[in-house]
């Protein structure tokens, strides 16, 4: 189910140029599909713990899946870009309820402990982000509506699978308040990780959402490019990240990965008209992102003396802000200046994340 949920993030990516052409929209207008999705996802993270502690993890997962099925289907039946933007916001609400609860559920039911559960979660993220664009490209070559209906069907399958196969999990003894994630951000270690992730996500989503407009490829071709990116992300998140963490430590490896991601974005910015370089840089970035995602997710769980779901919700609330702003701003920067500029700004944002992480290193001795 997690794989399918994360497929929804990358599924729309290959069809962004198609939607722009067929609905007569500008790149920045089309990028609002990601902005509304990420903004609502981030804001909704505040309430996910409160919902889960009242109706239980299993029913929270099912509610999130139901909303994704509903709004993805509505997105496929939309007639203009404004409608799709609103439906993507509803999709983001379902996504928040699902992914915030899914990590906690995987930790509770997996047999390999927290570290093993996080690797499983990141593997699902990588597989979803690789298969999503591939499926989106194939369905998008038929119609831009295809990927929306495809997600709706797949999430309906996930809904049935969780309903049947996931055992009922007990509700937390203590009900979570909507203010608990905000209170958790008082812990400087967690706040440091969240602010770093906000800046890192700015670069991540600049790469994910604006490179389709730079490449000018068909939906199928874009699908294969991001499939390669997602496969590399999945491999490094599962097999490479744990080894690097043991060898160089969490913070040391994270500094390095952030620096490499910033350089990668800079290379894309300098070579936006060289499609071979851009494609290679996108796929290589997947490797850096995979390592970083695993390390950062693990560190967040150890950065503050609060329950894991609360730490995850607080962290996600902040970090998705970067994911919400980047797509729209990338389109605007390209319109105002040139297609090079969004990647320069993305590189600067990720580099700033290194400075934020270094400034809060004294609060991260436990990670």
Model-derived segments and their meaning:
Residues 87-127:
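Cytoplasmic helix-loop-helix junction between adjacent transmembrane helices
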Residues 119-164:
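Helix-loop-helix hairpin linking two adjacent transmembrane segments in secondary transporters
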Residues 24, 56, 77-82, 111, ...:
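Helix-breaking motifs and short loop linkers at transmembrane-helix boundaries and internal kinks
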Residues 167-194:
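Juxtamembrane intracellular "pre-TM" segments in multi-pass secondary transporters
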Residues 251-296:
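C-terminal transmembrane helical hairpin of 12-TM major facilitator-type secondary transporters
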Residues 43-79:
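Conserved MFS/SLC helix-loop-helix module at the cytosolic interface between two early adjacent transmembrane helices
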Residues 190-229, 233-234:
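Extracytoplasmic gate region of multi-pass secondary transporters
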Residues 45-56, 236-250, 334:
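Helix-to-loop junctions at the C-terminal end of transmembrane segments
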């Amino acid at each position: 189910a997690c794989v399918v949920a994360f497929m929804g993030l990358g599924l729309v990516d290959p069809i962004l140029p198609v939607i722009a052409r067929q609905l007569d929209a500008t790149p920045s207008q089309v990028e609002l599909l990601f902005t509304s999705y990420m903004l609502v996802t981030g804001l909704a993270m505040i309430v996910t713990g409160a919902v889960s502690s009242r109706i239980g993890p299993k029913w929270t997962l099912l509610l999130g899946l139901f909303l994704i099925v509903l709004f993805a289907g509505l997105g496929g039946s939309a007639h203009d870009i404004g409608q799709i933007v609103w439906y993507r916001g509803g999709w983001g609400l379902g996504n928040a309820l699902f992914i915030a609860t899914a990590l906690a559920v995987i930790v509770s039911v997996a047999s390999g402990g927290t570290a093993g559960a996080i690797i499983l979660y990141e593997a699902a993220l990588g597989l979803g982000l690789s298969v999503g664009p591939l499926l989106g490209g194939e369905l998008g070559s038929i119609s831009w509506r295809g990927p929306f209906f495809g997600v709706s069907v797949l999430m309906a399958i996930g809904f049935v699978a969780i309903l049947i196969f996931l055992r009922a999990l007990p509700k937390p003894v203590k009900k979570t308040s909507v203010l608990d994630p905000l209170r958790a951000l008082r812990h400087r270690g967690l706040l440091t990780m969240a602010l770093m992730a906000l800046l890192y996500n700015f670069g991540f989503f600049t790469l994910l959402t604006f490179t389709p407009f730079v490449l000018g490829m068909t939906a199928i071709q874009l699908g294969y490019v991001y499939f390669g990116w997602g496969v590399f992300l999945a491999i490094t998140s599962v097999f490479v990240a744990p080894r690097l963490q043991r060898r160089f430590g969490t913070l040391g490896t994270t500094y390095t990965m952030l620096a490499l991601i910033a350089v990668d974005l800079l290379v894309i910015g300098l070579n936006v008209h060289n499609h071979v370089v851009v494609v290679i840089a996108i796929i290589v970035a997947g490797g850096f992102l995979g390592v970083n995602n695993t390390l950062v997710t693990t560190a967040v769980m150890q950065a503050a003396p609060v329950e894991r779901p609360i730490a995850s919700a607080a962290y996600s609330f902040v970090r998705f802000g970067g994911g919400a702003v980047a797509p729209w701003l990338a389109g605007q920067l390209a319109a105002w200046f040139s297609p090079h500029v969004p990647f320069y700004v993305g590189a600067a944002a990720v580099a700033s994340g290194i400075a934020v992480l270094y400034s809060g290193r004294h609060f991260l001795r436990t990670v």
